[in-house]
Amino acid sequence: RSSSAASDVYKRQVQYLWEELKKNDDIYLSKYSGWYSVSDEAFYNEDEIEDLDNKKVAISSKSPVEWVDEESYFFRLSKWEKALLEFYEKNPDFISPASRKNEVISFVKSGLKDLSVSRKSFSWGIKVPNDDDHVIYVWLDALTNYISALNYPNKDDELFKKFWPASVHIIGKDILRFHAIYWPAFLLAAKITPPKKVYGHGWILSNEEKMSKSKGNILDPLEIIKQYGLDPLRYYLIKEVSFGNDGNISQERLEDCINSDLANNFGNLCQRVSAFVIKNCDSKVPEKIKFENDDIKILDEYSQNLDKLRSEIDNQNINYYIDYIVNRLFEANKYFNDQEPWKKKDDKIRSVSYTHLRAHETRY
């Protein structure tokens, strides 16, 4: 399908969702008067605005806002306040982490106002069906992407049945409201099951501040990858930033992490194990070895924790998993020193079994 054809299909999908909402009396025409941020593509209430350098800005993003006074279509968000709270209660894991969940529920309980879902002053965008003077609000348009790729509105399509509802939307905390309030409200109104979970991750900070060109504190990931490699950067971010919270990073801490965890801890263990495998096992990890009680305890402990570790990953607690692995590697190096296998020249079997155990640890 050509890009122009795909674009036409997508427009029809967005317009179909619009018509479904309108058919159910969830969209009506009225007049909007209030603050709007072009850069945030978001509407703000009066209590979400402040004065900064003689300008009106959004408190959350510091982006400039302008007063808008124009005809607009509205989505009856207030109508879905009770349904949303019931949905959150029936699906307690829908919003994570807990701090974000509390934030969203508190906002909904404070009272939802109907949401402006069209702009009359914009020339670009998808036209409102049967009203070319209006274009559909960008977030109603953009959120439809999640289901348009699954051939919505055909809910019997194999892609739609296989992948919807989505297991998780992982999004930035600054757009949590769109995904955890507006999106499920749109879907419930259109009789579509919302995703199973929305996870609002934090920001990556540099020197305790949000990165910006004006502050000159941006760390270019492409340059870092050139210097240190992609996997070390991934590892550092996962370990350093507790998922769901803001995380402060620096090049110095990246280097310390690579040296301590990947080189001195993991790398050292790999080098030691490889040397023993080459020397005692013809460069192959042995398959059948008789372990001693201390070895069996270690392997049993690993096996018993696998389900918990998988659960932590499923719940986006990836840094917990990383911490567990780092601690096990540290213990493996300590066990290596305590056992002193290099002194067991006359105990070939013990040397080989020890090598087998350590090799399993590096693969784990």
PLM region descriptions:
Residues 12-13, 60-279, 321-327:
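Structured secondary-structure scaffolds
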